[in-house]
Curated annotation (Swiss-Prot):
Organism: Human adenovirus A serotype 12 (HAdV-12)
Superkingdom of origin organism: Viruses
Name listed for the protein in its UniProt record: Early E3B 10.4 kDa protein
Keyword hit for Membrane: yes
Similarity comment: Belongs to the adenoviridae E3B family.
Length: 91
């Protein structure tokens, strides 16, 4: 689970950097107006999706660790072994 979250945290950086690298070599004076607007739309959509992905994954990442910290701090007599196994915690 942690590796999946870390991969999803890296995806926005990869998407943004690859999009900006691809667009940085373009010369807008040589392109038709429609192509420039299409590229601008693509870059904007990529940035918005990257920000949304980063936000959602960050919330999941913090929630993942917050649940484990709260569960470990809870009084030991209330800790359920089945829940600990579900959270993959060591007793």
């Amino acid at each position: 689970m942690v590796t999946v979250l870390l991969i999803f945290l890296c995806l926005p950086v990869i998407f943004s950097s690859s999009t900006f690298a691809a667009v940085s070599d373009l010369d807008p004076e040589c392109l038709a107006p429609f192509a420039v607007y299409l590229i601008f739309t693509f870059v904007t959509a990529t940035c918005v999706c990257s920000i949304i992905t980063l936000l959602i994954t960050s919330l999941q990442f913090f929630d993942y660790y917050y649940v484990r910290i709260v569960y470990r701090r809870h009084h030991p007599r209330y800790q359920n072994p089945q829940i600990a196994a579900l959270l993959q915690l060591q007793p």
